């Protein structure tokens, strides 16, 4: 009986978490889904950003982070039940952050695999970052 209950709990938890893994493509930028760029300001300046995206740094240049600060800014942009996408340089940081947001906090997250570098490689023209 305990095994059945444990199995049901795991299944229910998996169903609640809504994490999608999608390749970052120029076509994705045309969708009507908010894109949150979690890179650093230096990275935003270096490559530019996706047009219409929102910039909220998660990890700073030294790898430090503040979940509270990030969530405060995120919650000003998206509703808890609203689907949104995360992008970083190549998808490593967003892989970790999107999994955390989805599995621990039940956000509806799309991880843009390959990041901004994949989009640029496929011909996407970023816009300059303005503070």
Predicted regions and their residues:
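N-terminal hydrophobic targeting signals that begin at the initiator methionine
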Residues: 1-2
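Hydrophobic h-region of N-terminal signal peptides that target proteins for export
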Residues: 5-17
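Rhodanese-like catalytic fold shared by cysteine-dependent sulfurtransferases
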Residues: 16-31, 41-83, 92-131
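Structural scaffold elements adjacent to functional motifs in cytosolic proteins
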Residues: 35-37
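Short, surface-exposed ligand- or partner-binding patches at beta-edge/loop junctions that are enriched
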Residues: 86-88
